[in-house]
């Protein structure tokens, strides 16, 4: 069936008076029950007609509209599903939930797992940052929006419903809300994404697209017989109803306000205006008319940058009868107000659902939104904190979040301080860049933000002030977000076997304490020995592999490594190998197995303790379980205090002392998600319909590792080290069981050794060390004082030996000193008005310092020295320092200095 046939096959439309027409403006087909309609009604073909003229029979608030929609589909046999987090924990390819169908990808849509209900309805908060730069400007764009949806998952021989029923539901819903059939347009717009495609109808009312009805029945294939957007597709066995109804757009259409922002969070908009430098009343009739006209024209003009934006503003100004300057005095501040209102709602969902701001991954997107909001607040001279607006959104929405508002507030306060530090440092950084480059390109601005966190507007402003050629690139924030919106694929090393083998029966799943077993050799390839069944654990999930022996025919074969490839366990055997068909006895090193088990179970206990002490935003970011220690990386916005670390360790050991049972079972994926939530996926997302769920005390995770039978078998847990390994990620290094005892014994040995060296009892070590430290600081101060005295004396001696150039003292010397002494001496000489260079031999290199107490730039002189002596450096105008390969003597230095002074004279 061709795409045209797919649309013509929707008999509901023809049976209910809808006629298929082609729009003369865009050339696309649409369906209408209005015999007079010739244009599709979709901007830019036609402007909004609902602004000032609501299309529903009554105005709705967000919660009212959401409930109305969900109830509508519940009454028609759909199971109501609770919203998923905006942080897509169940996905390995994307960070944020971008559509309601994303909740059910990849396992439900591929048919691997059943849907939580079929059919189902949901109102899913989604975050899309593709149009970040358009938010506030067009009147319709949002970073966070709720996609109300109903889905039906159809399988061969089991159809729930398809195109006719879907269009009928949409028409009935709109009719109930007060929209006449003649006012509904269904525009044909084939959909494609993520390797799938299908026919799609966009529901348009009053010029506003309120719903998208996708009929996903195609999969990408090079020999497919249907082409959509340049790719070829073929029919797939499963076919899915994938709809999206914009909650905010429904509310906007019901109110007919100038912008969507005025409809969905007017209280936040008013609060920002009342506490900012905005000097006009949003409810003023002239202001409302200007904003309404801007929204209408923005709808038909598309991208609003540069000349198109100027055209929009001139058109609106002419229509309303004001100057462009007067119009911009209203529109530009309002765009910032609307953007800030939108962004703070998005931040609430990001942080509330557990994102921790950082410089990488999903945390990058949270920080991007926060810093953009802080910049907007500065420009508006906002007399409130971002948290005040976030809290307002929470009250309006009434949603419950995993992360309490107190934690959200703490994160925002920390981010504000970090932003201020970045801005203060960034100013000089941009100035230095402008000194080197007279024109800043888009890539320069992206680099300044990505590497240094400097807001684009700030960089553009500073560069322009310094006379550089620069302009604000279009959609730069959207591009920044896009670069970081998808998780990087980790390239795993693929093991290729010559033959095919059945999946190994993995005995360690059922009994991790099993240390001996019987098996048969079914393959030998190189160093790999393949058995039909095995209790040897392969390296996986951050847990090191088992080691041990295979015993056969009186021989002993050492297993030094264990790997897995496509479900087949590969035993790396050192030396000779048992032959295929041999019956073997596997013997696992019990010490290695138990240490790994204790460390793995302890990892779960530690994670639980971290979440209890630090909060629900804590999420596993990596883990490693080895023989002598383990590590756990978690998301957190600052390094925990010593008191918090002590509390975490104490709680973990209480969990261990409580000797709670450790249980594991294979569960249906959807059932496990429903029962335990997405915290299951702390250690990653395992594939398949069924997943192994491990419960360690009060911690529950999808996990394929080996574990103790109870928390008591862990023995004890000792935190060895806590450090921040990157912004927003904290690493806990720890040991459990015997490894913990060994770690404590090593600490005690070091204490005894330190006590012996200082000749005091261990209990007196802190005071003794403190006393020595204070004495050392006093001596250090005295040394620094003496160095200054020496530098002064040395400077006087060198000034007496100085040459003269145009009545200036020129100093050039090779001295015996370290870099710190060189710099101090150079500062003294510069203070005395001298110009020159000092060199000193270092380990494997030569230190060089240039100085100028005159109009000349020491950095430029350093570059000249560097050309001759092969090196480089940097510094201030009065003193610069670096390293070179060649040690110049006094005469050689003077030659360079005199040449430099002559060239720069006047």
Swiss-Prot record:
Its cofactor is Zn(2+). Binds 1 zinc ion per subunit. Keywords: Aminoacyl-tRNA synthetase, ATP-binding, Cytoplasm, Ligase, Metal-binding, Nucleotide-binding, Protein biosynthesis, RNA-binding, tRNA-binding, Zinc. It is an enzyme of class 6 (ligase). Its EC number is 6.1.1.7. It comes from the Archaea. It is found in: Cytoplasm. GO terms for molecular function: alanine-tRNA ligase activity; aminoacyl-tRNA deacylase activity; ATP binding; identical protein binding; tRNA binding; zinc ion binding. It holds the Pfam family DHHA1. GO terms for cellular component: cytoplasm. It catalyses: tRNA(Ala) + L-alanine + ATP = L-alanyl-tRNA(Ala) + AMP + diphosphate. Changing residue 703 to A: Loss of tRNA editing activity. InterPro entries: aa-tRNA-synth_II/BPL/LPL, Ala-tRNA-lgiase_IIc, Ala-tRNA-ligase_IIc_anticod-bd, Ala-tRNA-synth_IIc_core, Ala-tRNA-synth_IIc_N, Ala-tRNA_lgiase_arc, Ala-tRNA_ligase, DHHA1_dom. One of its GO terms (biological process) is alanyl-tRNA aminoacylation. Its main location: cytoplasm. Catalyzes the attachment of alanine to tRNA(Ala) in a two-step reaction: alanine is first activated by ATP to form Ala-AMP and then transferred to the acceptor end of tRNA(Ala). Incorrectly charged aminoacyl-tRNA(Ala) is also edited in situ by the editing domain. Belongs to the class-II aminoacyl-tRNA synthetase family. Homodimer. Consists of three domains; the N-terminal catalytic domain, the editing domain and the C-terminal C-Ala domain. The editing domain removes incorrectly charged amino acids, while the C-Ala domain, along with tRNA(Ala), serves as a bridge to cooperatively bring together the editing and aminoacylation centers thus stimulating deacylation of misacylated tRNAs. This is Alanine--tRNA ligase. It comes from Archaeoglobus fulgidus (strain ATCC 49558 / DSM 4304 / JCM 9628 / NBRC 100126 / VC-16). The lineage of its organism: Archaea, Methanobacteriati, Methanobacteriota, Archaeoglobi, Archaeoglobales. The gene is alaS.
